[in-house]
């Protein structure tokens, strides 16, 4: 995909060397953005082999709302480095996507949803939580029938909670995304505080593009664009040679995604099929923990 290769080249040409917590220095840039037209195909990278099944298991783990990887690690090991022996994570994206904590004590002048809100439930421990994904789906559907919500601009999902993020071992990197409708096309914009261009960004691109396709199908929209802003877009120094190799490879035709005719919350791993995917060989990159 040309947009990805353009990003790699830009960071290699313009990045500034930075030290970081991992012990492996990076070359970094500020606020890199790109767009992909999802109507032209599924943007799974072809200039190296991508492990689609691992990404798909990760996406369904997010959508499960689980705060641990006990089930995920049976399918893929991509989160093992950040979990404890029992599979617990200090931060889990899906936990906030589907179960964002709702305060029951408000500051003066503030209001919060309660159990009368259709997207709020109470956990076994008594905590009120908000299902942001269901809110997005219900709002997008209502926009088709309710003139007061026809051009909604409040379809935002947040995985960042300051009280958690300031003490977590690895707070969310891709921490917020928003949906937007133009005509009958559903668009998604992802904001990421930190992006590992060799390893993380290809997965993020594939994951959120697929999520956009799934929600568009559920809500009766055509797929539009996926836009991505990475605040600290960086390349680890031990990834440079592999990425230079990737730059020499010509992108191949984009693949397609087939989604089963089921409701969004009934979809499983087997209901998402990758079609016509061809790629160049694997390029191995070490994970910086």
Task: Describe each region flagged by the PLM.
Residues 1-289:
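Terminal, non-catalytic protein-protein interaction segments that mediate quaternary/complex assembly
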